Amino acid sequence: MDNYQTKNISNLLTSLCFTTLLILAPVVICTRQHRFDSPKRSLLANEQDLVTGLPGQPDVSFRHYAGYVPVDESNGRAMFYWFFEAMDLPKEKPLVLWLNGGPGCSSVGYGATQEIGPFLVDTNGNGLNFNPYAWNKEANMLFLESPVGVGFSYSNTSSDYQKLGDDFTARDAYTFLCNWFEKFPEHKENTFYIAGESYAGKYVPELAEVVYDNNNNNKKNGSSFHINLKGILLGNPETSDAEDWRGWVDYAWSHAVISDETHRIITRTCNFSSDNTWSNDECNEAVAEVLKQYHEIDIYSIYTSVCIGDSARSSYFDSAQFKTNSRISSKRMPPRLMGGYDPCLDDYARVFYNRADVQKSLHASDGVNLKNWSICNMEIFNNWTGSNPSVLPIYEKLIAGGLRIWVYSGDTDGRVPVLATRYSLNALELPIKTAWRPWYHEKQVSGWLQEYEGLTFATFRGAGHAVPCFKPSSSLAFFSAFLSGVPPPPSR
């Protein structure tokens, strides 16, 4: 999900879209970063990051590591990761980097402990439960809190936080990978994938492009450094602002969240392909009406009861971003909506990760000088300084480069709904390889799937924004299919 607040609506929401220049993939040269104060940890000493004695952790046979990797020595910038080895054959199985969106939301708080990690946060943040559908059954899983300012990731230079945007985030994530592989050289040759959901629909292809370009440049320049990137996996992803907005509105109307009249006004007054759309007061008011209706339900899972009193939900709907704000950007930008699923588990995660014993065990702090961990950083969200309006050109580039791209969508998500994703993918005009069909898991229809030349798209029937929260078993099966490159079964 910039530093843009537009009249009325831009402060009522904040969101899917911005309209800045399409970033070119930056070329980043991997150089070894030396340690700096806090944390004082050698890049090669991964054993110092081995997690032992995590409070409430179930007994497991695999190893996991957590800690900081520096990405800018001079500015004192470091990123926090949590890495889970595959449950068996970790040296042979793929390595998958998982990113959550926001921008400003934690992949540790969401992906690792609410969705696909082996330890799910317990009720009231008292401990952890083993996840029988953890994705490290199939791969080594690396969770990164990105960019700095998210979760435990930090910078000692305050001006860094004013630069946060897509380009900055992709560069830092690539530098993180370079330095992380110095810590874990045994995984340098593993096949590598990047996965994520929501606003990571921007992060993932942008980072993949940086990796892809640097691999090619390193090869031309005779460098031996190479990240073995094979593909990307995207869940309910923000993709192309114009199509995402249109799909967001059409989904709300087709699922009876908004009235015919509201839909008609938006259709008539909102040109989501135009930079000037948000200067239209009638459009702003109609879009605000959509948000008003979504305020009453869970936008991330429209048929799920809301968590009354949930802090993340309250901060989203009731904070300053949802009220008028006197700051008007000189360049009108579209509003943004916070990404990430917000059930009561958000509060439990906040309690758990602010415990002194947990932070010490994860090497996030010394257990005395505690970090103030939050699942989403609203300052990052409100001050994002550059978002790619569409990553579809990156899709085209990666497809041409032979990388695997799979996209999935939970069909009860109102935040980045299935219609938005279908509109975005249709804009690519890819040839259809296999026609629309159901796909099955445990003899039941899990969703529908269509294969294009270079891309596979699937839906999850009855799943919300964070698909693995709703369909853990079928999402694990789908993940396994993605890694194999073979679509899930077309019959019972």
Swiss-Prot record:
Gene that produces this protein: SCPL31
InterPro entries, sorted = AB_hydrolase_fold, Peptidase_S10, Ser_caboxypep_ser_AS
Name of the protein in question: Serine carboxypeptidase-like 31
Q: Which PROSITE patterns match?
A: CARBOXYPEPT_SER_SER
PANTHER family (UniProt xref):
SERINE CARBOXYPEPTIDASE-LIKE 31-RELATED, SERINE PROTEASE FAMILY S10 SERINE CARBOXYPEPTIDASE
Q: So which domain of life are we looking at?
A: Eukaryota
- What are the transmembrane regions? none
Q: Which GO terms describe its molecular function?
A: serine-type carboxypeptidase activity
Query: Which Pfam families did the record assign?
Result: Peptidase_S10 (PF00450)
Q: Name one GO cellular component term.
A: extracellular region
Q: Which organism is it from?
A: Arabidopsis thaliana
- N-terminal signal peptide: 1-30
Where is the major localization of this protein? secreted
Give, as one word, the top-level EC class. Answer: hydrolase
Cystine bridges:
C105-C376, C270-C283, C307-C344
- Glycosylation: residue positions: N156, N221, N271, N372, N383
What is the role of the protein in this entry? Answer: Probable carboxypeptidase.
